[in-house]
Amino acid sequence: YEELGEVLIPYLKESGYNCVEFLPLSEHPCDESWGYQNTGFFAPTARYGTAEGLQKLVDQMHQNGIYVLLDFVPVHFATDDYGLKRYDGGELYEYPSRDVGVSEWGSCNFMHSRGEVRCFLQSAAYYWMKEFHFDGIRMDAISRIIYWQGDERRGVNGNAVDFIRFMNKGLKERVPNCILAAEDSTNFPGVTAPADQGGLGFDLKWNMGWMHDTLEYFQLDPSARTEAYHKLTFSMMYAYNEHYLLPLSHDEVVHGKATILQKMNGDYERKFPQARAMYAYMMLHPGKKLNFMGNEIGQFREWDEKREQDWNLLDFPIHEAFYHYMKELNHLYLDHPALWEKDFNRDGFIWLDCHQEGRVIYAMQRMAEDQTVIGVFNFSAQPQNGYAVPLQKDGSYRELLNSDWECFGGSKKREELVYENGCVLDLSPFSAVLLVNG
């Protein structure tokens, strides 16, 4: 833990991240579970050091302005005999029925109707925030709590839903500013509504629909994107139903799914401009952002818990330029409140143009009190010259970023153009241009 702080904290600051989420750090017997099958809910894994070392790491991150979240697993636990399974010789923490007692991963499901189980899990979640100063927790597999075995056809598990509401309400009472995030792929309403108003009490919900639509779109041959044009507009139909987070997580870079960069259509050189444009689209889209480690350097090999990332990729100019782009994009995001201040308010976003199916151009606008940022995207394989941005308001607009600048691995010289009387853009293939007012 302590050695990690010496390397990770400077890297996060340089890369433009203000928050880090750790995969589960509760003690677990199997590396291949990534920490999601726990045996020690009150014990930091000894793989990386001592409890004191973890406390020091979190405090050092706070001293450097970095929030720290922890992945927490309230759904199931490992089946090892020295863990919670049949703890007193009977089914104490788990269900007696195998039909609902065994998860799809072969682990034991918690029986959330029992008061003892509820207190155990709520105490464990609070323990990590109280003793280690984590700023919040991301709860895994919430769909498996809402519905029996995560299957909507089997109906809502009322006791488990009551437990989540009860736990979140209690955590907010004890740690009012904590961040509670739900990994949930269901359409169950009110996940981020306050618990005392009938919601589940989370602050954020993973937007799995946005993630699937976006990645599927960029895997398409560019010739098919005209027909699939509205895959990238559909998410705004429900964007304000919950407080969403846009996740490009560990789950999307394992098990044969390919890495984020590899998912982009085309050959090696063609993938990079598409990934740059996609990440710009992500930053302009309402919702908080999550990016898994390695995505920022253009990792080509799927994540393997037994190996570190392929840092030698940065010896290749195209990967170094991609990392330079991701750093600048992250810092740009943090420095412009229009991109995050009104993520959950309808007056913080507007489509300027979402009817350019033939040219595969999109234009959107993000707003804060005194700032406007416009994103214009060409996701076709052809240059789109002479595109007149349909501005809502006349005035001066300055080019913040062009994903096709040479410094990012593109073809255009960095000029940071200023537009005074309308914005007419020459858009490179697979490119994004960001503009700011004033």
Regions found by a protein language model. Name each.
Residues 133-135, 148-306, 334-340, 344-389, ...:
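Conserved alpha/beta catalytic core and glycan-binding cleft of carbohydrate-active enzymes
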